[in-house]
Amino acid sequence: AKLIQRANDILIQSLRVRLFPVTAPPQPVDADFQLRARLLEARDPDLFERDPAALLRIFIVYAQHPELAGFEPTTLRALWRNTIHIDAAFRANPAHRALFMTLLRQPVGITRALRAMHRYGQLARYIPAFGRIVGQMQHDLFHVYTVDEHILTVLRNVRRFTVSTLAHEFPLASRLIASFEKPELLYLAALFHDIAKGRGGDHSELGMIDARRFCRQHGLDKPDSELVAWLVEMHLVMSRTSQKEDTSDPEVIAAFADKVGDPHRLAALYLLTVADIRGTSPKVWNAWKGKLLEDLYHATRARLAGSDQAMANIAAKQEEARINLALYGLPKDAADALWQHLDARYFMRYSVRDIAWQARMLRWRVTSPDAVVRARLSPVGEGIQVLVYTPDRSDLFARICGFFARIQYTILEAKIHTTRHGYALDSFQVMDLANRGIHYRDFLSFVEYELARDLDPARPIQPVPRG
């Protein structure tokens, strides 16, 4: 398929030049290349045979000129014909290795240049391990791209974090990468994170070995090489932890923080993880997964900063929540009646938005003998968020889960907390996976009323439908 694609490109460009000949003189770029009608052209047809380093330099020039639409057909044919010169000796040449790293350090055009290298065969020749996964399908429920396309999509996603005009898409990722001194390390991790798929064995460990070797060969010092290798080895850990473990559990956060080690690695892993999930399929990423990752990042960051920083973060959350409550005309002490019964773990688990909402909903019900149920549209993504506050008892969780099972709603997240005075303060993120088109305003009232009825201890536990 790639061969057909390359031949097709050459044919189309050749026909375009013949049908629409360019009369304007070319614009010189340097001693080797020039621009002709938005196409990049080698000034000497024998350039690549005479100077094989130009096989890499042409892509640096291509990255530096975003106005270019492609390559002049004669140059494209010469590029394709001379790709055979990218062999073991070529890859071992320090000058060529320096050129590849220069490409990865360009301020713009990196993704476009690497996609062109892939399209015309140079990337697979320069990184043989990449050549082995070209066109390789991934037989799982999530990946919709071949391994090579997935890798380049992940790299593109990392690059998008650096674009200031797109900062609104992922504000945290944008802030983190802006302070990342060497973003090329992230690009290398993206290139190698799945490069060992299909070999047998753990592709994370095999890819780590490839990445470490490549980095050391390309002049990266040991700390930088180890960071890239570590990212490749650990690239699945953050997503698994955020989606499969209780990240409100301090022991889970402590274990994850031990694996990460320091804030710099945490930031790098977060950036790669977000880019990786988004590059799996257009349907896999959602706002809920984004929130899980952000929560894990912030909790781990606080853990790495130490207990003093954690307490400072709690105080900051409380102050911000008070400001939020003031927007509803509530006094500064409106939350005190509830907060006096809550420990530090509660404030570490919840966002400011959730803390303020729960305080507002429970202000006059802190010692209510009856169950309090409040529901709202989820502030992150689809579905609804349900707050349950009631004197704690042993059958409470079973009753709540049974209710959502009966109305055919899936529980995406459950946060269970017990106050100092013996009340359960539980929060549920639920979603109608069947997309039945329910009118949410009426449905929120239904949940608040019916779930509160089901939690009446005088009522028997309702049966859960089977099948």
Where are these predicted regions, by residue range?
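Divalent metal-dependent catalytic cores for phosphoryl transfer on phosphate-bearing substrates
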Residues: 1, 6, 146-147, 173-306, ...
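Regulatory modules associated with amino-acid/nitrogen control
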Residues: 1-44, 110-112, 120, 251, ...
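Non-catalytic interface/linker regions that flank or bridge core catalytic/transmembrane domains
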Residues: 1-143
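Active-site-adjacent "gating/activation" loops or surface patches in catalytic cores
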Residues: 27-41, 50, 119-139, 145-190, ...
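Short acidic (Asp/Glu) and glycine-rich catalytic loops that position anionic groups and cofactors
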Residues: 34-39, 76-82, 91-97, 129-137, ...
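Short helix/loop capping segments that flank catalytic or ligand/cofactor-binding pockets
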Residues: 50, 66-70, 124-127, 163, ...
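Conserved catalytic alpha/beta cores of large enzymes that bind or transform nucleotide phosphates
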Residues: 83-104, 159-165, 177, 215, ...
